[in-house]
Amino acid sequence: MNALRKLLATGRTIVAPGATDALSAKLIEAHGFDCVYIGSYATAASRFAIPDTGLLSLDELVEQARTIVEAVKLPVIADAEGGFHDAPEIWRTVQAFERAGVAAIHLEDHTGAG
């Protein structure tokens, strides 16, 4: 059973502070949290100093996630926007985050770029 499933099985509230980069993820880990969250807004702001308006590509989100996953031993949950369009792209999105080592993603129910 992976680390996130074990955490969820405890039934307790899990606090997953948002990381903007590997350093902030390391600080989250050092302060004893159980999990790390990566939001698309944090990625857009920290990497490009832009608001989250759906302009980030799947590759940009996954690369940020991979960098954070490699920096910590905690499970990482990532914002995968809207899955990047249709069913085949959503499948590709899931696979890309899985290969990056992300424990879970969430998909938003919006239309638009991401």
Which sequence ranges carry the predicted segments?
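N-terminal amphipathic alpha-helix/helix-capping segment at the start of soluble metabolic enzymes
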Residues: M1-G18, A22-H31
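Structural preference for beta-strand elements that scaffold enzyme active sites
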Residues: I14-A16, D34-C35, P75-I77, A104-H106
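Glycine-rich anion/phosphate-binding loops
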Residues: P17-A22, L55-V62, G82-A100
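Catalytic domains of carbohydrate-active enzymes, especially glycoside hydrolases
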Residues: A25-A42, G101
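Glycine-rich, proline-tolerant flexible connector loops at the mouths of alpha/beta enzymes
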Residues: V36-E60, G82-A87, I105-G114
